[in-house]
Each structure stands twice: as C-alpha cells, then as structure tokens.
C-alpha cells in the first residue's frame, strides 16, 4: 500500500457511495458500492483475503470515490460506472446472448417478424423463445393460420406468399380492414396463451367441412390442429396464470456466485440463463449488481413479474426494474425460486468439480510426477525431439509445459546446422547446447525438468552437454516408446532406470501429452521445411528465375502443383517476362515427363 492510498483511506466518509479502484496506469480495474464507504474501502487493505481478492488488491495503485444520497442511488451509479468503464475485475455479462421474440409490427397492415431486440416502437413483442428454431416454428404455424402481409407497401402485384395462401397482399388488393384487424387480434390471443380457443374453432371448421363432404378442407384443418399441438406441447407448463415472469435464484461458495434465471412465458418454462462469476463484496450486494446489469447490458425483456430470494433487498430491485418484484413465501412461486437456487448450487458444485479435475490433470499430475521421480514438482518442463528422413532437412523442436499446460508462445524450432547425415545424438548435442547457452546468456528461466523423446544415448548426450559444457544441473529424463510408437517408459536417474508409473495415472497421461506434442511440433516443422526445399529445388537452374521471382510465384500460386498446371499466359500474368515464363513452363513439363518415364 503506497502513501497516496494511506492518505486517502484516512479521509474516507462514512456515507454511501461508489469507489473506483485504479492500477498504476490509471485504468479503472474495479468498481464497487458501499453503504459506508469508509468501512468497505478500508477492508481491502486490512487482514487476509482469498487469492482472487489478493490479486485485485495487488494491482490497486489509487482509488476514487463518489458519495451518493442513498444505497439505491449507489447501486444505480455502480451499474452505470461498470457499463461505462468495463473494469476487468467486475462482474461483466460479456455473453451477448439474446433470445428471439415474435414481433407484431406497428404499421397500417402489421407484419409478423422474429427479432432479438425489444425496441420502444409501439410494436407488440411475445417471448422470449428458447432459440430461433422455436420462434421460427411458431411463426410458420401462424403464417399458415393467419395470412398477414409479407410484401412491401410498394408491391402492387401479388407476391409469392399470396399464391401460397400466406399473404393477403393488402397493397395489391382491397382488403377489409376489419378482417385484417381480427386476424391480428387472434394472433395476439394465440401468443398470449389462447391457442386452445383457436384449436376449438378449427375443430368446428373441420367437423363442418367433413359434414359437407369437403374432405380436403377438413384434412387441412386437421393438419393445422396437429401443428398447434406439436408446437405447444414441446414446452412444459409451470403455472396456470399465464403471466410472464423471470425467476432468480443464487448460490455462493469459495468467493464465487452462480445466478440462475428461469424464463417463464405464458405459464411455460422456456429457458434458463446461468452465470458464474467471482465476487468481492457482500453476496447480496453482488446479486443486486448482477440483476441490474442483466437487464441493462444484455437487453433482456423485462417481464410483468420478477421473483427473487427473500434475503435480497426488494426495494433496491424495484428501483432497478420498472416491474412487479415479488419475494414469494409459499406455494408454486416459492418452489420456483427454491428450484432456481438449487440449480445454482448444482452448477457451482459442477464448476468446482471441473476445476479439481483440471488441476488433477495439470498441476496435480506435475506434483505426482515429481514425487515419482523424487524431485521437486517440475512446474516448468521443456521437451525435445528430432525429426529427419535419411538425414535430409534435419530439425529439432522444443515444447514447454508450465503447470502441466502447454505454453505455446515459448515453443522453439531448430534447424540443425553442424550435423551431416542422420545422427540423432549429434543433433541433440547441438540443440541442447544452443538452447541452454542462450538461457544462460539472456538470463531466461531454467526448466525444472528436461524430457528427451528418445532413449539412453540421447539422454546421456543431453546430460553431458549440460554438466560438462555449460556447467548447469537440470534433471534430464528420457521418454521411450513401444513398437506402436506410443509412450512406454520414463527413464531417469544416474543409470536411467524405469520410473514406475501407473498407465492410467494422470502423471503418465501428462507425459503422453508432452511426448505427442513435441513429436507433432517437430514433424510439422520438418514437413514444412522439406516442402519448402522441394519447391526451391524444382525451380532451381531455370534461366531468368531468381529468388525474388520464385517467392512471387509461390505467393501467387501457393504450391508447385499449381505452378506446374499454369499456362505460359498465366505465368506471364503472375509477373514473369514472357521468355522466363516459357522457360519455367518448359522446365517443369520436361521434368514431369522425365519423372514419369523413370
């Protein structure tokens, strides 16, 4: 804690407000609210905290605060400040997932549309639907039942949908406004839960058509009834009052919060939203911040009712939302809130289980590997592999694993410079010397363990370079493979003995991942180099074709195959003089012919 912070802490007021934590660059990294600023802000710099809070505090170089008249005013201000500054340590609802709605437009002849944005445009919105397929299904059904306008006002001739019976084309024909208005009212009724009335009317029409021998019409009405049943029975009923409501529940553990939101529309539970995030303040305060951001930043539709747990300040939620807020004490609504909270607890437990499993695969495996080898946990592991074909284009590659995870930005590729022919020992000697002489020279971190994809000979070479040429002491082990080219044994110690490892253990799986990764990286580099050299050799000794023109050809045609397939005119268009283009064409086609003859 610097002097500036100490001085400011002494001046903090005992009033409600917001505080803005800044890093050394003056960037706002966290925004919080407090009932008493003095107590809340000082708490960050006193006593012990969990790891994530300590990380936040370690970055604080300065802070500001804004005093407000009330706690609710502080809550509203906090949400606005978070939205404006996007602090990295705040609850940020970065998932821009929005759910689709069915919209009846506010026009002379309204249309049905699917949209993800609810605007203040005097249109009617119904939803949200769990996904766009559900919304499309419902809209297609309504298009069959009610032929609202699909065409533009400028359309003076019948559109395609008119011929399909799904558009009245009111701008091409005279349409009774009352007929159109009645259709819109029926759609509103359907989307508000009145589909049973429409089914009853269709049943009557089907019976009437059948009685009058109009069997095609009767079959059409029957299909429409089935379509309604199919669409409506896919969603589970949760309430009989058909009120749109969002149901909130939450759970906290180990400094993390999970909030679950159930979306209930026309009495149906259609979807849920799950958010898991760390929090630094009081849990109920963090929940209030979440609910404010939930509706403000993700543009969620605000329903007629919002149900919240009874330990949340209802007055604060009402200040955030212009809708009815309830804290049910009994009955079905109470069960829904409890169910949302139960699901939140389950989701949070699943997250921690996944973290534990991930740790077992990574840092846990590293610790167990260290125990098996009787060395400190090898937090940083560097692994090497050679690759060549009959000594051509020899390369080596190094991969780095930190805490059991690949650190790909630290991978390195090596072209072998001092070795002629297939000599893996000499290649390994060169690469180990190049790597660790540079580590010494530049003061880079040494690994805790070096793994060599190879047997005793290559490991001995690596150990000799480190001890006798560079004077460094780093544990070196070998990864041997079986006849199926799979990780078989870990060789370690003065006499390179087999380290006993269970084949289904996480430490063995870690070694497999490292060996597979270094092999992949080395062989990919070798193939790239071989392909590049092959390309260059095929274009060697062509009169007029220098390095620059070769490079331009590769850039233009991407491969030797494409260059060979190109005509003289295409080669000329790629920037070659006509004489050189003919030389290239003649050379490649002569070479192809001679290769076929062989």
From Swiss-Prot:
PANTHER family: UVRABC SYSTEM PROTEIN C, UVRC/OXIDOREDUCTASE. Belongs to the UvrC family. It comes from the Bacteria. HAMAP family: UvrC (MF_00203). Residues 196-231 form the UVR domain. This is UvrABC system protein C. Residues 14-91 form the GIY-YIG domain. One of its GO terms (biological process) is nucleotide-excision repair. One of its GO terms (molecular function) is excinuclease ABC activity.
């Amino acid at each position: 804690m610097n002097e500036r912070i100490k001085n400011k802490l002494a001046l903090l007021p005992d009033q409600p407000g917001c505080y803005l934590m800044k890093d050394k660059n003056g960037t706002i990294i966290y925004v919080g609210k407090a009932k008493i600023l003095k107590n809340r802000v000082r708490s960050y710099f006193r006593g012990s905290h969990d790891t994530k809070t300590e990380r936040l505090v370690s970055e604080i170089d300065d802070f500001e605060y804004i005093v407000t008249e009330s706690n609710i005013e502080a809550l509203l201000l906090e949400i606005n400040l978070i939205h404006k500054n996007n602090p990295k340590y705040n609850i940020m609802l970065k998932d821009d997932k929005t759910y689709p709605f069915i919209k009846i437009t506010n026009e002379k002849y309204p249309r049905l549309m699917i949209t993800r944005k609810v605007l203040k445009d005097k249109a009617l919105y119904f939803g949200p639907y769990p996904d766009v397929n559900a919304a499309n299904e419902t809209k297609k059904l309504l298009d069959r039942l009610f032929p609202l306008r699909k065409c533009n006002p400028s359309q003076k001739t019948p559109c395609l949908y008119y011929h399909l019976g799904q558009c009245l084309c009111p701008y091409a024909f005279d349409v009774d406004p009352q007929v159109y208005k009645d259709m819109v009212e029926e759609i509103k009724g359907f989307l508000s839960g009145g589909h049973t009335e429409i089914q009853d009317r269709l049943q009557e029409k089907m019976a009437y058509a059948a009685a009058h021998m109009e069997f095609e019409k009767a079959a059409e009405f029957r299909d429409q009834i089935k379509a309604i049943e199919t669409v409506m029975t896919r969603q589970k009923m949760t309430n009989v009052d058909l009120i749109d409501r969002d149901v909130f529940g939450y759970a906290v553990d180990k400094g993390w919060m999970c909030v679950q939101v159930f979306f209930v529309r026309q009495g149906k539970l259609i979807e849920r939203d799950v958010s898991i995030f760390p929090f630094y303040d009081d849990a109920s305060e963090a929940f209030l911040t979440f609910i404010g951001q939930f509706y403000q930043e993700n543009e969620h539709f605000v329903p007629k009712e919002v149900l919240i747990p009874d330990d949340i300040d209802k007055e604060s939620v009402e200040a955030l939302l212009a809708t009815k807020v309830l804290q049910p004490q009994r009955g079905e609504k109470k069960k829904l809130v409890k169910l949302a909270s139960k699901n939140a607890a389950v989701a949070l437990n699943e997250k921690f289980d996944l973290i534990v499993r991930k740790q077992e695969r990574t840092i846990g495996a590293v610790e167990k590997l260290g125990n098996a080898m009787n060395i400190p946990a090898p937090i940083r592991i560097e692994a090497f592999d050679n690759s060549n074909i009959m000594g051509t284009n020899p390369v080596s590659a190094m991969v780095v694993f930190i805490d059991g995870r690949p650190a790909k930005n630290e991978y390195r590729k090596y072209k072998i410079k001092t070795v002629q022919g297939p000599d893996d020992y000499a290649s390994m000697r060169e690469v180990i010397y190049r790597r660790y002489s540079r580590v010494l020279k530049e003061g880079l971190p040494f690994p805790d363990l070096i793994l060599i994809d190879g047997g005793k000979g290559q490991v001995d070479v690596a150990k000799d370079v480190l001890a006798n040429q560079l004077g460094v002491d780093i544990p070196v082990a070998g990864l041997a493979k079986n006849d199926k080219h799979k990780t078989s044994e870990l060789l370690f110690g003065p006499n390179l003995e087999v380290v006993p490892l269970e084949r289904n253990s996480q430490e063995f799986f870690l070694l497999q991942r490292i060996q597979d990764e270094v092999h992949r990286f080395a062989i990919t580099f070798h193939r790239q180099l071989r392909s590049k050299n092959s390309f260059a050799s095929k274009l060697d000794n062509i009169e007029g074709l220098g390095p620059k023109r070769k490079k331009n050809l590769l850039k233009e045609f991407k491969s030797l195959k494409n260059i060979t397939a190109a005509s003289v005119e295409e080669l000329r268009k790629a920037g070659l003089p006509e004489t050189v283009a003919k030389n290239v064409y003649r050379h490649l086609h002569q070479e192809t012919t001679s290769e076929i003859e062989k």
